[in-house]
Amino acid sequence: MAEQVFQNFETLQLHAGYTPDPHTRSTAVPIYATSSYTFNDSAHGARLFGLKELGNIYSRLMNPTVDVFEKRIAALEGGIAAAATSSGQAAQFLTIATLAKAGDNIVASSHLYGGTYNQLNVLLPRFGIKTKFVRSGKLEDYAAAIDDQTRAIYVESMSNPDYVVPDFEGIAKIAHEHGIPLVVDNTLGAGGYYIRPIEHGADIVVHSATKWIGGHGTTIGGVIVDSGRFNWNKHSERFPEMVEPSPSYHGLKYWEAFGPATFITRIRVEMLRDIGACLSPFSAQQLLLGIETLGLRAERHAQNTEKLAKYFESSPNVSWVLWPGSESHPTYAQAKKYLTRGFGAMLSIGVKGDASAGSKVVDGLKLVSNLANVGDAKSLAIHPWSTTHEQLSEDERLASGVTEDMIRISVGIEHVDDIIADFEQSFQKAYGS
C-alpha cells in the first residue's frame, strides 16, 4: 500500500520537514547551536565545498534547525525549497541581488510597505539596480514598464497599508511572456494560509517571518521560497549567471547541476555565503513554535478583522475603511478570487478631524499597542504617515496608499469585543462621542 501523503495546511504546519532526531528521538525540533560541522575526512569536506555533495558546512549557509524551518515553509507555500534569512528585508534584498546586477531594473507595484519602497527606491540604485514603479495596477502598465534590462516583477500579495490585491495570474502571464519571474512578498498572506501565490503563477515568494509566521512579536526573520517552475535555461540571455560557468565554484553551471533548484541554490551558496544575512537556530526554533499554531491564529485573526471592519463602517468617527473584504475596496474582486481562506488580518481606517486626529486616537488606545510591527497575536495600531512611511516624500506616501488621516491596524486574537471597546473609549476621549 502506498504511503499516505498528508498535504493539508494544518497538518503540514506541525509535521513538514522533520522526522525525530536520530540521536535522541526528540519529538520537538532540537536547537543545533553550532557554527560548524565535523567532516568525515578531508575528501568529504572537499566534496561539500565543491557542491559535489550537499550537507552541512557552516551555519551561515545551513543549519539543521534552520533546515526544518525552511522545509516547513516551502511545504506550506507549495515551493520546492526555501532559504531562511535574518529578516524580511534581507530576504527581499538577497532575492533581487540574485536576479539583477548593475544596469538592470525591476518593475514593482508602488503599493508597498515603506521599508520595501525605500530599499527599492534608495538603496538598490546605489548598486546600479533601478526600480520602475507602477502606480495604476493595470496589466498594460506592467507590460509597458518592462524592457530588455528588466529582471523581475515585484508585488505584495496584500499591500501594506492599503491592502491592494494584485491580479496575480494576469501579472504572472505578462512576466512570463517577457521571460522574467514574478516575485511576491506574501508576508500578509500568513505563510500561505490566506493565499499561496505560487498556485497563481508566482515564481518566487518572500516573507518577513517576523509577522504571522512567528506570530508573537518575539523574533526577527525572513524566508525565500522557490517555486522551481521558472526555466532559467530558457531565459539565459537575461540570467546568464544561472547557466554559465560560475567563477565562485571553478566553472560549475548551476542549471546543469541543480535544474529547477538553481535560484534557491544560488541564494544559499552565493548570497548567504557572501552577504551573511542568515537566520540563527535559536530564531528558527522560535519561528517553528509559531508555525505550529499558524492556521488557528490566522483563522481567528481573519474573523476578528472582519468584525472590527464592520464596526468601523458604522462608526461616526471614521470617514473610511480599507479592508480587502469590503465590497468598496478597489481590488475586492481580486481579493474574493484569490483570498479563499479569509481576507487577512489587517485593515486601515481614516479618522475624522484635522491632521492630528489619527495620532490622538492611537495615543488613546489602552489594549491595542502602538508599535511598528504587524502579525502579532496581540492587536497593534500605528499612524503610518508619521512613522513607517515618514521617510518617504508626501507624493511617495500618497502613491503607497498612505494618507495623513490613516490608522493602520493589525488585528490580534483577543476577544473582538474587547478590541472594539478599546477603540470606543479612545474615540470617546478624542471626539467626546
From Swiss-Prot:
GO terms for molecular function: cysteine synthase activity; O-acetylhomoserine aminocarboxypropyltransferase activity; pyridoxal phosphate binding. SUPFAM superfamilies: PLP-dependent transferases. Its cofactor is pyridoxal 5'-phosphate. Gene3D superfamilies: Aspartate Aminotransferase, domain 1, Type I PLP-dependent aspartate aminotransferase-like (Major domain). The keyword Transferase applies. One of its GO terms (cellular component) is cytoplasm. Pfam families: Cys_Met_Meta_PP. Coiled coil: none annotated. Pathway: Mycotoxin biosynthesis. InterPro entries: Cys/Met-Metab_PyrdxlP-dep_enz, Cys_met_metab_PP, OAc-hSer/O-AcSer_sulfhydrylase, PyrdxlP-dep_Trfase, PyrdxlP-dep_Trfase_major, PyrdxlP-dep_Trfase_small. PROSITE patterns: CYS_MET_METAB_PP. It comes from the Eukaryota. Fusaric acid is phytotoxic to plants such as cotton and banana. It has been shown to induce programmed cell death in plants. In addition to a mild toxicity to animals, fusaric acid exhibits acanthamoebicidal, antioomycete, and antimycobacterial activities. Sulfhydrylase; part of the gene cluster that mediates the biosynthesis of fusaric acid, a mycotoxin with low to moderate toxicity to animals and humans, but with high phytotoxic properties. L-aspartate is suggested as fusaric acid amino acid precursor that is activated and further processed to O-acetyl-L-homoserine by cluster enzymes aspartate kinase FUB3 and homoserine O-acetyltransferase FUB5, as well as enzymes of the primary metabolism. PANTHER family: HOMOCYSTEINE/CYSTEINE SYNTHASE, HOMOCYSTEINE_CYSTEINE SYNTHASE. This is Sulfhydrylase FUB7. It comes from Fusarium oxysporum f. sp. lycopersici (strain 4287 / CBS 123668 / FGSC 9935 / NRRL 34936) (Fusarium vascular wilt of tomato). The gene is FUB7.
